């Protein structure tokens, strides 16, 4: 359905590629109501990427994923970055964000309190910033 909606050329091949990338190949013929919450989350991400958007907005995509799902998502996000796609990742987990991001923006109550390229960020000082924001 979504491939027709987006006009995806060769939709079966594209869907199969994303299903494999997200580690859902074994269960692709299973009804989604039998999927775990992590599998459903990975399926939603695959569906969002079906039409190869240039901008991808992901709000807490690691939520509900097991360690394997997190690893698959991290690999996928890094690949999207190397393909030149823009990914806006919203997360409360600094380490996840740092691993896949080129630039990190920290917001507090709708205001930007820190913005820097990933290479300039020291995790320890960032952890201190996070706890200072949480306390306030």
Predicted feature residues:
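Conserved ABC ATPase "signature" region
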Residues: 1-27
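Conserved catalytic motifs of ABC-family nucleotide-binding domains
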Residues: 52
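Catalytic Walker B motif of ABC-type/P-loop ATPase nucleotide-binding domains
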Residues: 56-59
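Helix N-cap at the start of a conserved alpha-helix in ABC-type nucleotide-binding domains
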Residues: 67-69
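H-loop/switch region of ABC-family ATPase nucleotide-binding domains
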Residues: 91-92
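A short, surface-exposed alpha-helical micro-motif characterized by mixed small hydrophobic
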Residues: 97-99
């Amino acid at each position: 359905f979504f491939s027709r909606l987006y006009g995806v050329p060769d939709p079966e091949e594209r869907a199969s590629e994303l299903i494999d990338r997200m580690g859902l190949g074994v269960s692709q013929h299973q009804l989604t109501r039998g999927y775990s919450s992590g599998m459903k989350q990975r399926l939603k991400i695959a569906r969002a990427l079906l039409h190869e958007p240039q901008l991808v907005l992901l709000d807490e995509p690691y939520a509900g994923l097991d360690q394997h799902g997190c690893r698959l998502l991290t690999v996928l996000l890094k690949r999207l970055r190397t393909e030149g796609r823009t990914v806006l990742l919203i997360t409360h987990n600094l380490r996840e964000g740092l691993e896949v991001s080129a630039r990190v923006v920290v917001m507090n109550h709708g205001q930007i309190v820190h913005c820097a390229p990933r290479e300039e960020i020291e995790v320890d000082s960032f952890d201190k910033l996070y706890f200072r924001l949480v306390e306030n």
